[in-house]
Structure formats: C-alpha cells, structure tokens
C-alpha cells in the first residue's frame, strides 16, 4: 500500500506527548478553584429515576421468562432457535408497523393524546417539496435519500445554481456516512447488496469458505473508487475543514485508509484544522498504512503531535482508538498501552469498559501467553470492581465476553466469579451487548464452572442461568454430562436428558450417544437402572421419528448396542430383543458385550428359548464368539435334549462357515 504524504518523524518517548493538555487541564482546575460554588436549590432527577429505584429492589428471578416475552408467556421460547425465531418475528412485526405508518402517514392522523405527544404520531417520510431547488435537496438529505439527493445536486449544478457550502457539506456527510449507498431500512435491504450476497454464495463453496472475523470495512462495504463523495468534493468551489473531515472519516470507515491520509495531507496544506473525530478515525486507520510495528506506532504518535499543534483536545474515543490500534503493533504494544493509560489519567479522562477490553487484547493473545502477562485481568478487576458503568464507547459491549474468555483460557474460576459479580453490579448487565454476545459470555462461564467446580455448585448455577438467561448449546450440555461423570452423579442423567429435549438438542448425535454411553458403561442399582431403561426407550423413539424432523438420527452400532444393553438391564426383554433385530435392518453388527449382556438377562429370566434365539442371531452375523455363546447356554441353562442338539448343530454350522471363510481368504492371498 502506498504511503501517505504525511512526513513521519522518529519518536523517542511518549510520556510527554500530551503534556500540553495536562497543563491546560491543571490551569483550568486552578481557575475553577477560585470560582464561587453555586449550590442548586433542588436536585434534578431523571424521568425514570423512580422506575430505576424500584428495579434495584428486585433481584433476578431464574424462573421468570425474558422481559421480551412477558406479554405472551404461552409463547415463551424453550430453545435457542425458538428464542431467535420469536425475537425476530416480534421485531419484524414492529418494523412492519413502522413501515406502514411511515408509508401511509395520512391514515394515522387521529391524535387522542392530551397533551399532544409528537413521538406517537407518524413521521412524514415522503418528500413534500417538489421541483429542483436547494430546499428540496435539504429535504432529501433529511430523509436520508442518498441517490435522490445526489441526482438533485447534479440537476442544481446543471441549472447553474450551486448549493450553499452548508448544504453541500450536509450532502457530503450523508454520502460519506453510508459509503455512497442507500441506507438499509428497517424491513428491507438494498437490492444491490442482496445481489452481491447472492452472487458470492453462488460462486463460493460453503464448505471451503473460511470462518473468520471480518473487518468492519468488509461488513459495511468498501469505499468505491471515484464515488459520488469524491466527485462532489472535487466539484466544490470552496471547502472548509468540515468538508475535509467528513471525507476523511468516510474513507477511514470504509477501509480506504491510504486515501484518507492523502486527504488529511491536503487539509494540512490548506492550513485547516481537523476535529477530534477525524483524528480518531485516522488513528484507527494508521495500522493499515504501515507494515512494521514501530512504523505503525510512529504514525500514531505523529497524529497525536498534530493534535497538540492544532490545539485539539483528545477525548475518551481518542485513547481507545490508540489502544485498539496498538493491538496490531505486536509485542512492543504492552509498554505503550500502559503509557496510554497513564496519559488518560493525567488528563482526567475516565476509562470505559472498551479501554480495558483493548488493554486485555494487547496483553493477552491466547492460552499460550506467559502467566505473568495474563495477570493484567486481575489488576483490571482490582481497579473497576464494584463500579457502575454506562455506555460511552460502542466497543464497551465486548469487555465482559472477552474477559470471560481470558478466565476460561486461564481456567481461573475465582477471576470468573469476580467478573460475574462486576457484571451484576448496578446496570452493568445492560452492557452485555446483543443476544450472541450474552450467550457467548454465559456459555464460557458455564464451561469454566463445569471444568473447575463440584457438581452441586454447577447445578446451582445451572438452575440460575438456564433457561432464563442462557440457552446452552450442545457443547455446554456435553460439559455438564462430563461433570456428572467426574463427580459420579449419573443418577441425574434422566433429568438432564429431559432438559436436553426441552432445550432442543435431542437431535444432536454426539450428545445423544454421550448420554447412552454414560448410562450403559456401568451396571447401576435396580431403581436407577429402571430409570435408565425409560430414558433409553425415549431416545429410541427419537430414532424412529424421521418424517417430522429436519435432522433425522441414524442408528450406529454403538447406539444400538447401548440401547439394547440398557433395556436388557432394566428387564425390558421384549423391547431389547426388538432392538437386536434392528442390527440387521440397519446393517450393523452387535458387539460381544451386547450379546453377553442379553444372555445374562435371559439367565435371570430363566428363558432358555430366548438364549437359543440369541445364539441363532450370532450365527447369522458370523460372530467369532458364537461357539462360546452356545457353550455358555448349554452350561448355564437347563436345556432339553432337542435344544442341546440344536445348539450343537449351530456350533457345527458356525465352525464350517468359519473354516470356509478362512480358506477363501487364504486362497485370495495366494
């Protein structure tokens, strides 16, 4: 990538970069100390202060449904897929209502509110000013009609009427903010974007498509070469700082970092001053300009120096942008990140959760990081524990999820408890982000609990989190089953299986087979064995229902054998025998252990005919232990002379078939 025209200088240290701002802050603080203190006569309360006070008196109810579903408790979802479908359906209905009201506002003019409440009345989203005029252009800009605004601007120029600088800057704001694309409405997507997605899906193999995080510019779209924003900017007879800053921010937002720095160079050549938002955008784009880590940092420092020279005071987002860019600066970023935090404190700028999130990103790169470097999370929690935060940076919502990932990689349950306590403090739970981020946070927390805690504590959290706050995926339920196995609490498996069905994971093959393996591994007391048998029958019914489910379960030799063994141990001989018949139908071969288990059940029931039928089944499968099976029947069962002859014939037929198969294999080798 071509380097911008900005001249970079070498930087020796960064501790005094923003000392100018520190001095200004101290000067203002000294001046303020001589001012008179004006004590207000009354305290101003927020409009929802009473509701907030009432909310603090109520703790979380793990049995209550999500607040989104309070209106329809009957339709409250029980699975993650139902949650997604319900929430999307509700939001779709709300957006559809907004669309109808916005499209036909004349049908909703009955104002019954006294006094008048403007927000309850429909907004007029259709243009009212006709013709080619600057007023019509302002209206299209206000309505966020990108294409119509550009067309109207061109018509004004062709008619010899140039819009004012203020109006042109507003148009430039609109085009740069949306990347010269129509904004995505509430219930519709741009036809061009839909076509791009469709073309991409047709040309790419979904199996070979890499699963990785994309840049923000890739999600938003790229900055097209010579788009309307650049064209209008070049057509402007006069430009002010706002014109340059708008174009720079748009280019940086949509991934055209090199162009953004070129425009910034033009801004400086015109002796104009950039605002703090523009510097923030350039700092975020700086790592994309340079290749080496030290060059990336030098460019960031150069921008900070320009802020000092242009008397632009940094804000919280400035320092967060520096920390976010430092995440791309390799090992050298650790010391620089701490210096950045010290600069924030010197300027009396309170860090936000995004600040600490970027700090974790700088110091913690993965589970293989040295232990001493990962203790930064403990120090962060020491500083922010017990505090209440508000949303001050869009990246604030990523802190809890990423911090819990650090706890999981470190397998530090105490840190996880401290983090969760912070999340429960005041209104901090409102900074969890969307449903995906919340589910990721609770999933990692529950995974760590299953690895590190006893089963009693795990079940306590299980009842508190599920399903009121978290719908576990199949991986989470597997972790719970492994925890039950480690603490030898297999008696809880029947109840957990009911939860698995309710949550909607009964069609996950790995999960179903893990349940069967745990139940069939050891012989349990009769009462528990009977419960296992009922669970095995329930699982068997899932394999038989194939028309009403999208993902049908297919019998494997292991699942067939486990269900057969569980039914035999539970005394359900008829059902167990039917399961043995399914082996041949499913083209599977029963194991020796399954046949021994079934023969033991036949011995308990003193059912000689069933034992002989089992030997006949083994002969049909040409199992190597058929002779031992027949010998065991003759020794352990009371057989008649006719039955003995039958068993001997079965042994002879098995021996002859075995010898013929071995001779054929020898001839094949010759």
From Swiss-Prot:
One of its GO terms (biological process) is mitochondrial translation. One of its GO terms (cellular component) is ribonucleoprotein complex. Residues 187-213, 648-670 are annotated as: Disordered. PPR repeats lie at residues 129-163, 164-199, 209-239, 240-274, 275-314, 315-351, 352-392, 396-430, 438-472, 473-507, 556-590. Residues 193-203 have a biased composition (Acidic residues). InterPro entries: Pentatricopeptide_rpt, PTCD3, Rib_mS39_PPR, TPR-like_helical_dom_sf. One of its GO terms (molecular function) is ribosomal small subunit binding. It is found in: Mitochondrion. Residues 1-13 form a transit peptide. Residues 653-670 have a biased composition (Low complexity). It comes from the Eukaryota. Keywords: Mitochondrion, Repeat, Ribonucleoprotein, Ribosomal protein, RNA-binding, rRNA-binding, Transit peptide, Translation regulation. Belongs to the mitochondrion-specific ribosomal protein mS39 family. PANTHER family: PENTATRICOPEPTIDE REPEAT DOMAIN-CONTAINING PROTEIN 3 (PTHR16276), SMALL RIBOSOMAL SUBUNIT PROTEIN MS39 (PTHR16276:SF1). Mitochondrial protein that may have a role in mitochondrial translation. This is Small ribosomal subunit protein mS39.
């Amino acid at each position: 990538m071509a380097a911008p025209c900005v001249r970079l200088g070498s930087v020796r240290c960064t501790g005094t970069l923003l000392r100018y701002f520190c001095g200004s802050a101290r000067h203002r603080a000294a001046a303020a100390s001589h001012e008179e203190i004006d004590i207000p006569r009354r305290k101003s309360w927020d409009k929802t202060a009473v509701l907030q006070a009432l909310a603090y008196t109520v703790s979380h109810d793990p049995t209550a449904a999500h607040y989104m579903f309070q209106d329809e408790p009957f339709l409250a979802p029980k699975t993650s897929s139902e949650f997604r479908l319900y929430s999307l359906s509700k939001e779709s209905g709300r957006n559809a209502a907004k669309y109808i009201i916005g499209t036909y506002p004349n049908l909703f003019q009955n104002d019954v509110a006294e006094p008048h409440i403007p927000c309850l009345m429909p907004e007029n989203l259709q243009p009212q000013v006709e013709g080619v005029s600057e007023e019509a252009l302002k209206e299209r800009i206000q309505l966020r009609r990108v294409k119509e605004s550009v067309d109207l601007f061109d018509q004004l120029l062709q008619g010899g009427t140039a819009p004012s600088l203020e109006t042109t800057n507003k148009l430039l704001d609109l085009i740069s903010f949306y990347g010269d694309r129509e904004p995505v409405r509430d219930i519709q997507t741009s036809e061009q974007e839909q076509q791009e997605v469709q073309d991409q899906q047709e040309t790419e193999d979904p199996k070979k498509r890499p699963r990785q995080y994309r840049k923000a510019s890739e999600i938003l779209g790229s900055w097209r070469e010579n788009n309307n924003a650049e064209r209008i900017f070049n057509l402007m007879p006069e430009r002010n700082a706002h014109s340059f800053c708008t174009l720079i921010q748009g280019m940086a937002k949509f991934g055209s970092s090199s162009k953004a720095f070129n425009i910034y160079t033009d801004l400086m050549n015109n002796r104009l001053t950039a605002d703090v938002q523009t510097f923030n955008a350039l700092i975020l784009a700086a790592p994309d300009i340079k290749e080496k880590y030290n060059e990336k940092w030098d460019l960031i420092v150069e921008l900070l120096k320009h802020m000092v020279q242009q008397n632009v005071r940094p804000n919280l987002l400035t320092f967060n942008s520096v920390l976010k860019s430092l995440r791309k600066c390799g090992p050298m970023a650790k010391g620089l990140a701490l210096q950045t935090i010290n600069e924030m404190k010197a300027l009396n700028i309170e860090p936000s959760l995004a600040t600490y999130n970027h700090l974790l990103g700088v110091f913690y790169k993965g589970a293989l990081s040295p232990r001493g470097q990962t203790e930064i999370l403990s120090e962060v929690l020491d500083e922010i524990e017990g505090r209440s935060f508000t949303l001050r940076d869009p990246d604030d919502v990523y802190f809890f999820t990423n911090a819990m990932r650090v706890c999981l990689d470190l397998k530090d349950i105490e840190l996880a408890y401290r983090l969760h306590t912070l999340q429960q403090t005041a209104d901090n739970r409102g900074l969890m982000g969307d449903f995906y981020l919340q589910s990721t946070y609770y999933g990692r927390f529950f995974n760590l609990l299953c690895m590190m805690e006893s089963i009693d504590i795990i079940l306590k959290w299980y009842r508190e989190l599920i399903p009121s706050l978290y719908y576990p995926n199949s991986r989470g339920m597997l972790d719970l089953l492994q925890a039950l196995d480690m603490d030898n609490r297999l008696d809880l498996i029947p109840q957990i299986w009911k939860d698995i069905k309710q949550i909607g994971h009964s069609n996950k093959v790995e999960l179903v087979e893990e349940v069967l393996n745990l139940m069939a591994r050891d012989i349990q007391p009769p009462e528990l064995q009977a419960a296992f048998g009922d669970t095995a029958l329930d699982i068997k019914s899932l394999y038989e229902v194939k028309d009403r489910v999208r993902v049908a379960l297919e019998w494997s030799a292991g699942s067939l054998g486990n269900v057969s063994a569980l039914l035999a141990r539970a005394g359900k001989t008829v059902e167990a025998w039917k399961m043995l018949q399914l082996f041949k139908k499913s083209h599977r071969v029963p194991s020796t252990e399954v046949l021994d288990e079934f023969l033991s059940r036949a011995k308990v029931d003193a059912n000689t005919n069933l034992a002989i039928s089992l030997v006949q089944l083994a002969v049909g499968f040409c199992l190597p232990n058929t002779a031992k099976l027949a010998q065991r029947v003759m020794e352990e069962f009371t057989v008649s002379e006719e039955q003995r002859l039958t068993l001997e014939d079965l042994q002879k037929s098995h021996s002859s078939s075995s010898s013929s198969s071995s001779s054929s294999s020898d001839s094949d080798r010759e």
